Amino acid sequence: MDGSRPETCAECGFDARQWRVRDAATLFGALGFWWRLAIADVDLEILNRRPAPAVWSVLEYGRHSSAVTAVIRSALELMLAEDGRALGTPALSASAIEGNEVVLGHEAVLDALEREGQAMAALAGRQSAPWGNVGKLPDATIQAEAALLHAAHDVSHHFMDVGRGLAALGGGTPAAQGRVAQLNVSAGGVPKLDLGSDEAVIGWRGIEGDRQADHKHHGRPFQALCLWSTEVIAELAAAGHPIAAGCAGENVTLAGLEWASLRPGARLRVGTALVELSHPAVPCQKQTRWFADGDFARISYERNPAWVRWYGWVREQGRVRAGDAVIVQP
């Protein structure tokens, strides 16, 4: 974050030009929930173990993310209240140091992530806030919106680090292999239609040529792809529901994976692209017609965690076609 150009990151794919203030508000509002899903039932010893001496543990990353969120939120409060406000330099550790490991309790870390995430979401959700205001750091001038998006970059990048750390330590989603059963696109709305054997390009915003009709609730960077399971679809169809691949709006239909094992932070090599799961997709009324009784909420996380569709970030762009392998935790 230098205050003079849009922030980008080659490692995680972050590009501030692809983000809106409301995207950041949604991210921070869900931060604690995503973290809870990502580390649910993982042994505390694994959560406190560093994958390498100079790489933070999962819980150290969580503590850092809540601290960064709190510091940037405090600065934003000042900037939004007074344009040109002078800001101090925050004293935050930017990386792990070998030998300074800290053992943490997971509930305290999760509570802090939820508390700070909700506070930042409330700030970002303010109507007509002057996001063009600037703050003056000792060595740079930073716009309020850029500072907010820097915070979004920090927590999302470290959420990626958490997923990689859990995979390296054998926690979270286990390694597995499946395949791409179908790729689906539309000009907006459902159903999305089968691409057949055509190759698709997966960019930072998802499958090229696919569109969303509702940009208020869809199309955020952490919703670049929506993935679902042929096994779940087959189970629903066998129960009498008129549903098929693409009907529920997923643009990547996968086969051969233990769907209930997936969680936020899991990484999937889909064709040559690398996808990281972000959060369960919330079903909507447009999907009513695919269920015999109209009860589309049966595929919500709250009702049936093993039936949910998953949203994902694109961490590495690539190409894919139906039949390609899908490697979980490559």
Language-model-detected regions and their locations in the chain:
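Short, contiguous alpha-helical
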Residues: M1-E7, G13, A25, L44-A94, ...
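Cysteine-cluster motifs in flexible loop/terminal segments that predominantly coordinate metals
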Residues: G3-A16, T288, D293-R298
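Short, charged, low-complexity loops and linkers
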Residues: A10-T26, N100-V102
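Acidic/histidine-rich alpha-helical segments that form the ligand environment
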Residues: L27, L31-A40, A75, S93-N133, ...
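A mid-sequence interfacial segment
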Residues: G88-L123, A260-D295
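Electropositive, beta-rich accessory/interaction domains or terminal extensions
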Residues: G170-V270, L274, H279-A281, K286, ...
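A conserved acidic, glycine/proline-rich C-terminal tail/linker
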Residues: T288-V314
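Well-ordered alpha/beta subsegment
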Residues: R309-P330
